[in-house]
């Protein structure tokens, strides 16, 4: 074998560890003639986490295969996706992403000089690109645009036009970046097939699409920037890494939905081609695995203990993160990180309260006083057959009276002594003569027969514990929500139950210090 890899060897490097390839025959033809031009794009929204090492390891493979690789910081996409990145923060977020992605690549030994970096707004605001957006919008149906973005663009009841434009812009990027292939997660598949359908209608060629698997989070679900307990941030301290791994789901012998084992498979093995289990001599001493399936087999047979697996992952992961932490331990990058991701709960109070501003009032979930409650008693409302009157302990000197319309949906005995989730800072309201001092939050699904389930706080929760949306735990709730301002109603529009039955606001989990708030079974339900 010579120094330069053969087309077959290049194909192996490009496609290994991928979940799916669309256009493999075209890929083979290109590799016979010249080097492949490929790009990977990332919308500059939430902070990148350790699962980003999966695309980084593939970028290393692409370079080994001789590919010309472009990394796109999709700043405009970050804004179009329900303004996940506010316009005024776009430049800062993009700078943060560029610095952290480059630090990740350096951490795994990827030469940066072989890569091209670009921003979406470097070319997406040009006359030619804008004209193509209009041309494409005249051909694409609303149905196809919404379907294409279903796994990527935030889904809301009343979608913004910007979110429908998102897939079209991503398709056009393939043409304007002059690439043969686009690389992304399997969650991008619908956008990729959208591009294959519509680019030829503009006279542009169909591209190859390369897809890596989505990395399960430490809780067993997909690793997500919006689930604090499911992911490890690239700048997490060593003690935070230890804490998150210690709490991660890793049942002895269970290889299904095992977030720690999956992390080894999808992140650590592709980067190092081996993994060492570190353990005391009395338990067999250290053992090196060069084939992932052998590690999985030993774990299933309980030859490898969860504690040893977690400790070994912790050591390996910190080796990857140390160079990134060191790079960001400078005043300039510390300042960049705090400016790009400002603490939403920080306010400047005055002696007379918050200063009045001409800016629109900030509608954020930390304004809601949501707590764990325990139902001490349940009675039928004396004047309304559909209402219960509950006495609920929410951590105050006296229990609160809460009226809820659950008679048709939840038997009285299921509510007695149950832990529930209560919104405590609504203005008290008379309901058929009884003052209701809160709202018992429930999941619901509409249909032929409406289904309703009270939200459940994590097991072991205590009355009065605060329920918050991850990232907004430090904010102070309003003393009382003013009905005219409709703060709760505006926030509630983005309340939803995930496919894992977790309560969310804008795809970010409701949680307590013990874990996530959930419901029993109503996937995709609303919350009220």
UniProtKB/Swiss-Prot annotation:
<dbReference type="InterPro" id="IPR002307">
    <property type="entry name" value="Tyr-tRNA-ligase"/>
</dbReference>
<protein>
    <recommendedName>
        <fullName>Tyrosine--tRNA ligase, cytoplasmic</fullName>
        <ecNumber>6.1.1.1</ecNumber>
    </recommendedName>
</protein>
<keyword id="KW-0648">Protein biosynthesis</keyword>
<feature type="modified residue" description="N-acetylglycine; in Tyrosine--tRNA ligase, cytoplasmic, N-terminally processed">
    <location>
        <position position="2"/>
    </location>
</feature>
<feature type="modified residue" description="N6-acetyllysine">
    <location>
        <position position="474"/>
    </location>
</feature>
<feature type="modified residue" description="N6-acetyllysine">
    <location>
        <position position="490"/>
    </location>
</feature>
<dbReference type="GO" id="GO:0004831">
    <property type="term" value="F:tyrosine-tRNA ligase activity"/>
</dbReference>
<dbReference type="GO" id="GO:0005737">
    <property type="term" value="C:cytoplasm"/>
</dbReference>
<feature type="region of interest" description="Disordered">
    <location>
        <begin position="339"/>
        <end position="363"/>
    </location>
</feature>
<comment type="function">
    <text>Tyrosine--tRNA ligase that catalyzes the attachment of tyrosine to tRNA(Tyr) in a two-step reaction: tyrosine is first activated by ATP to form Tyr-AMP and then transferred to the acceptor end of tRNA(Tyr). Also acts as a positive regulator of poly-ADP-ribosylation in the nucleus, independently of its tyrosine--tRNA ligase activity. Activity is switched upon resveratrol-binding: resveratrol strongly inhibits the tyrosine--tRNA ligase activity and promotes relocalization to the nucleus, where YARS1 specifically stimulates the poly-ADP-ribosyltransferase activity of PARP1.</text>
</comment>
<feature type="binding site">
    <location>
        <position position="170"/>
    </location>
    <ligand>
        <name>L-tyrosine</name>
    </ligand>
</feature>
<feature type="short sequence motif" description="Nuclear localization signal">
    <location>
        <begin position="242"/>
        <end position="247"/>
    </location>
</feature>
<comment type="similarity">
    <text>Belongs to the class-I aminoacyl-tRNA synthetase family.</text>
</comment>
<dbReference type="GO" id="GO:0005524">
    <property type="term" value="F:ATP binding"/>
</dbReference>
<feature type="binding site">
    <location>
        <position position="166"/>
    </location>
    <ligand>
        <name>L-tyrosine</name>
    </ligand>
</feature>
<feature type="modified residue" description="N-acetylmethionine">
    <location>
        <position position="1"/>
    </location>
</feature>
<feature type="binding site">
    <location>
        <position position="173"/>
    </location>
    <ligand>
        <name>L-tyrosine</name>
    </ligand>
</feature>
<feature type="binding site">
    <location>
        <position position="39"/>
    </location>
    <ligand>
        <name>trans-resveratrol</name>
    </ligand>
</feature>
<feature type="domain" description="tRNA-binding">
    <location>
        <begin position="364"/>
        <end position="468"/>
    </location>
</feature>
<feature type="binding site">
    <location>
        <position position="188"/>
    </location>
    <ligand>
        <name>L-tyrosine</name>
    </ligand>
</feature>
<feature type="short sequence motif" description="'HIGH' region">
    <location>
        <begin position="44"/>
        <end position="52"/>
    </location>
</feature>
<dbReference type="GO" id="GO:0005634">
    <property type="term" value="C:nucleus"/>
</dbReference>
<feature type="binding site">
    <location>
        <position position="170"/>
    </location>
    <ligand>
        <name>trans-resveratrol</name>
    </ligand>
</feature>
<dbReference type="GO" id="GO:0036094">
    <property type="term" value="F:small molecule binding"/>
</dbReference>
<feature type="modified residue" description="Phosphoserine">
    <location>
        <position position="205"/>
    </location>
</feature>
<feature type="modified residue" description="Phosphoserine">
    <location>
        <position position="386"/>
    </location>
</feature>
<keyword id="KW-0030">Aminoacyl-tRNA synthetase</keyword>
<feature type="short sequence motif" description="'KMSKS' region">
    <location>
        <begin position="222"/>
        <end position="226"/>
    </location>
</feature>
<keyword id="KW-0547">Nucleotide-binding</keyword>
<dbReference type="InterPro" id="IPR051270">
    <property type="entry name" value="Tyrosine-tRNA_ligase_regulator"/>
</dbReference>
<dbReference type="Pfam" id="PF00579">
    <property type="entry name" value="tRNA-synt_1b"/>
</dbReference>
<comment type="subunit">
    <text>Homodimer. Interacts (when binding to resveratrol) with PARP1; interaction stimulates the poly-ADP-ribosyltransferase activity of PARP1.</text>
</comment>
<dbReference type="GO" id="GO:0006437">
    <property type="term" value="P:tyrosyl-tRNA aminoacylation"/>
</dbReference>
<keyword id="KW-0539">Nucleus</keyword>
<dbReference type="Pfam" id="PF01588">
    <property type="entry name" value="tRNA_bind"/>
</dbReference>
<keyword id="KW-0820">tRNA-binding</keyword>
<keyword id="KW-0436">Ligase</keyword>
<keyword id="KW-0007">Acetylation</keyword>
<dbReference type="InterPro" id="IPR014729">
    <property type="entry name" value="Rossmann-like_a/b/a_fold"/>
</dbReference>
<dbReference type="InterPro" id="IPR012340">
    <property type="entry name" value="NA-bd_OB-fold"/>
</dbReference>
<feature type="binding site">
    <location>
        <position position="39"/>
    </location>
    <ligand>
        <name>L-tyrosine</name>
    </ligand>
</feature>
<dbReference type="GO" id="GO:0005829">
    <property type="term" value="C:cytosol"/>
</dbReference>
